[in-house]
């Protein structure tokens, strides 16, 4: 079977895959390489640092370790277990200064501008900075602390100034422009031509063409935005850490044993022994709202979660949102654009906000119509069983689960017994073998340092030739200081322009650890997310590009490959071989599989509406004049105009919408998940129609060749047409979600 499954009423958010700082590097064209730094004795420095005093010597050694070339096996690996925060600020400042010196050498080159001495030379800059950003990203996302957040706040404006200094270097841009407009470009390979185009656009669209006065204002805006966006993200994290609901044993009604065990462990970590903690994260909130029979507590947990950043205190984000929107609008106005979204989408697949809105609005009516049907089913059960008069937002998941059992005799918790985290990982390796010819071998000799004991590492090889491809790091479990959600990133990307570089990729999740000695069981939705993020890792590992910048992504395309990989979770090969009961070891019964298939489009009204509401509000925020905007009022009025069902809230309310306000990664681009899903649904049909189904070798080879290995070396629209022979069709998406498909006359 192959179906798009939805076994829980809300899908875990696919988090921002490149961490903010990696995206920052891409935008500055610093994903390349750089200054040679003196190689230090890493182990000696580490041993000295671990003695840890606050002396200047310790700071200098910490700085040297952060700047050091990576040593050890696999072309060198990060020393995650040895670096400390002590020297982060001076190391970052030194690396930025070195990078600016490299840029000045290129800008002041007396020779005529060429592809090699300008574009390729830029690709070679920033190696020290790249390494430091890898560590910075770990401290930001995987092991944040109050100490780091102070450093982050200090560095944000400095990083912004650094970026602006490069982007506003007139001599550098003149050289880039000269290459861009030269006859030389015409004889370059298509990939090299695209590198020139991406480099030119990254400057011309980011203030390089402005006069000196406007450049100064542009840089000042960026500096302030960096501060505001950092503050926004830290405020949300503060509310996630501060709000916890503690339960007594008598308040556990309806909760499966696995959830009770996780809640008990969370309470123990917070010195509330004998109680049960529901933390203010999606991974804790979601199952509680699905199963708890305590309606009052459901409301409390729901309010805590959807009020993050919106509590009228020091961590309230509404004023920050208003200022961010105003500054973004002013900044693109300097470039001549009517609004932020028009600027942002110009180089995306959608090309314009109007095209993105048209896609979303074509799906919206079917989504809210389905919500009406879902609510009617839920209310009937709620009245009959509990005497409720209306379904509230904190009831939706709870009664949706009851409807699922009533309509399909399908229990999400029963399915969960077959979803063991370790088995799912092996299933992903199986898919990688069949589609990519990859072989994953765990590195167990301690030769690859990790930043937490939960992290494990695998070497990736070509199964046929044995050629080394890279490493895959996995950090699966939730813990204090780790950002919520799930994401993928790279510590080093594939390139060949200075000798073949291997890939250091990672997947990061927030699964709740099982009880000691017991396997970790996860929901189907979380299993889809697991496969999704692994799809990003495969995209990194399959890269065949020559230059660092060609590893960058197009936002409304970059989720396509990862969304597509979710489909292999529900293939017969995976279900029959890897989805086995955690106690009996028996495979999932055919009767249960049949129920899953029948319920494939269940609750699509909820999942589509909560997502689209966020995407549409994001787009509306970035297409209006934000002067004097009240974000809370704007959100309410926008949803009212959309006729948003009152039983559903946006997946991300504005004060906690980190995708668009803690960085610019998804600003006016949250629609990109649906844009990519059109491609996903259409590509899935190519496999479904092939003789070998989802493991058809010919289709798989085309997938890897045209959609994974090329990264951003080929325009995404051209790449998809090379795979499919035509553009993707939205009708495939509508079929996937069980929505009516309009027949063409």
Regions found by a protein language model. Give the residues of each.
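Short, Lys/Arg-enriched N-terminal segments with co-localized hydrophobic residues
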Residues: 1-15
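Sec-dependent signal peptide recognition
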Residues: 17-24
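C-terminal, non-catalytic "cap/extension" segments appended to globular domains
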Residues: 48-83, 87, 94, 275-277, ...
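Short His/Asp/Glu-rich catalytic/ion-coordination signatures at enzyme active sites or charged loops
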Residues: 72-87, 136-155, 179-220, 279-319, ...
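Active-site-proximal, well-structured secondary-structure segments within enzyme catalytic domains
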Residues: 191, 195, 224-227, 234-279, ...
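Short pre-active-site segment immediately N-terminal to the catalytic Zn-binding motif
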Residues: 512-530
């Amino acid at each position: 079977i192959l179906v798009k499954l939805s076994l829980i009423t809300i899908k875990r958010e696919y988090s921002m895959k490149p961490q903010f700082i990696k995206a920052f590097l891409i935008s500055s064209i610093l994903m390349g390489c750089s200054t040679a730094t003196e190689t230090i004795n890493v182990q000696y420095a580490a041993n000295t640092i671990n003695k840890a005093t606050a002396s200047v010597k310790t700071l200098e050694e910490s700085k040297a370790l952060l700047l050091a070339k990576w040593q050890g096996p696999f072309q060198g690996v990060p020393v995650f277990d040895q670096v400390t925060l002590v020297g982060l600020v001076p190391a970052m400042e030194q690396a930025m200064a070195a990078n600016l010196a490299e840029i000045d050498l290129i800008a002041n080159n007396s020779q005529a501008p060429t592809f090699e001495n300008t574009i390729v030379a830029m690709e070679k800059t920033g190696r020290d900075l790249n390494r430091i950003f890898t560590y910075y990203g770990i401290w930001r996302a995987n092991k944040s602390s109050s100490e780091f957040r102070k450093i982050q706040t200090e560095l944000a404006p400095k990083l912004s100034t650094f970026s602006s200094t490069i982007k506003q270097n007139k001599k550098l841009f003149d050289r880039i422009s000269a290459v861009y407009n030269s006859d030389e470009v015409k004889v370059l390979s298509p990939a090299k031509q695209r590198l020139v185009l991406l480099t030119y656009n990254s400057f011309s669209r980011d203030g390089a063409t402005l006069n000196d006065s406007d450049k100064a204002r542009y840089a000042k805006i960026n500096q302030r935005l960096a501060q505001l966006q950092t503050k926004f993200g830290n405020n949300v994290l503060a509310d996630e850490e501060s709000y916890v609901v503690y339960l007594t044993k008598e308040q556990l009604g309806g909760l499966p044993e696995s959830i009770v065990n996780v809640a008990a462990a969370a309470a123990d970590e917070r010195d509330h022994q004998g109680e049960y903690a529901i933390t203010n994260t999606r991974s804790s909130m979601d199952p509680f709202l699905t199963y708890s029979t305590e309606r009052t507590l459901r409301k409390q947990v729901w309010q805590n979660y959807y009020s993050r950043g919106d509590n009228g205190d020091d961590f309230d984000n509404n004023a920050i949102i208003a200022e961010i929107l105003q500054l973004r609008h002013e900044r693109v106005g300097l470039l001549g654009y009517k609004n932020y979204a028009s600027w942002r989408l110009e180089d995306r697949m959608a090309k314009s906000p109007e095209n993105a809105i048209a896609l979303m609005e074509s799906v919206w009516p079917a989504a809210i119509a389905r919500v009406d049907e879902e609510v009617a089913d839920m209310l009937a059960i709620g009245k009959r069983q509990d005497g409720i008069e209306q379904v509230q937002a904190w009831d939706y998941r709870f009664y949706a689960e009851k409807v699922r059992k009533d309509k399909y005799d399908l229990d999400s918790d029963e399915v969960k017994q077959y979803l063991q985290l370790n088995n799912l990982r092996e299933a992903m390796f199986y898919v990688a073998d069949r589609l990519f010819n990859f072989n994953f071998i765990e590195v167990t000799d301690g030769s690859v340092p990790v930043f937490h004991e939960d992290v494990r590492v695998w070497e990736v090889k070509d199964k046929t030739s044995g050629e080394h491809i890279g490493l895959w790091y996995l950090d699966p479990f939730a813990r204090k200081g780790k950002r919520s959600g799930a994401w993928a990133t790279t510590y080093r990307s594939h390139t060949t322009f200075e000798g073949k570089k291997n890939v250091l990729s990672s997947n990061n999740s927030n699964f709740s650890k099982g009880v000691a000695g017991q396997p970790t069981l996860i929901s189907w939705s979380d299993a889809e997310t697991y496969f999704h993020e692994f799809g990003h890792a495969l995209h990194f590992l399959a890269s065949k590009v020559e230059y660092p910048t060609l590893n960058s992504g197009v936002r409304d395309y970059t989720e396509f490959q990862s969304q597509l990989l979710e489909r292999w979770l529900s293939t017969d090969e995976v279900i029959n071989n890897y989805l086995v009961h955690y106690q009996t070891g028996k495979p999932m019964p055919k009767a249960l599989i049949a129920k899953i298939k029948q319920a494939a489009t269940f609750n699509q009204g909820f999942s589509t509406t909560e997502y689209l509401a966020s995407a549409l509000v994001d787009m509306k925020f970035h297409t209006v004049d934000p002067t004097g905007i009240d974000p809370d009022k704007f959100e309410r009025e926008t949803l009212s105009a959309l006729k948003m069902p009152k039983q559903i809230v946006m997946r991300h309310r504005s004060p906690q919408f980190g995708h668009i306000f803690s960085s610019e990664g998804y600003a006016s681009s949250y629609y990109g998940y649906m844009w990519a899903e059109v491609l996903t649904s259409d590509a899935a049909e190519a496999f479904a129609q092939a003789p070998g189904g989802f493991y058809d070798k010919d289709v798989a080879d085309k997938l890897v060749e045209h959609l994974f290995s090329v990264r951003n070396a080929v325009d995404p629209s051209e790449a998809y047409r090379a795979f499919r022979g035509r553009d993707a069709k939205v009708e495939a998406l509508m079929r996937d979600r069980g929505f009516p498909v309009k027949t063409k006359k």
